[in-house]
From Swiss-Prot:
Protein name: Probable 4-amino-4-deoxy-L-arabinose-phosphoundecaprenol flippase subunit ArnF
Keyword Acyltransferase belongs to the record: no
Protein's gene: arnF
Membrane topology field: Multi-pass membrane protein
The protein's assembly and partners: Heterodimer of ArnE and ArnF.
Family of the protein in this entry: Belongs to the ArnF family.
SUPFAM superfamilies per the UniProt record, alphabetical: Multidrug resistance efflux transporter EmrE
Amino acid sequence: MCLIWGLFSVIIASVAQLSLGFAASHLPPMTHLWDFIAALLAFGLDARILLLGLLGYLLSVFCWYKTLHKLALSKAYALLSMSYVLVWIASMVLPGWEGTFSLKALLGVACIMSGLMLIFLPTTKQRY
């Protein structure tokens, strides 16, 4: 069950990151503070997505807290790297996002997935 909480945390954090990225690209820049505040107070789609992203991070922290009660920190922390993979894939697949495929990024994803497999594969104890 602890791994399930960890996966929930990763998925929710990935969705939250995508939501915040969407909101940041559609809201006025914070350098124009009054325009930014006005957009937040209007509570349009962009502001609602920003709020959902922030709430998503809060929910992700709760799931992370539940994960750390049962799963070793070394494994739990490594699990968070899956978020990078999910966000990269989602940015290429979802309409409106401008994620680009590159061999460098694919190599990075392969390294992350290889590391996760090394950490999470069951080990066999050798008898001497």
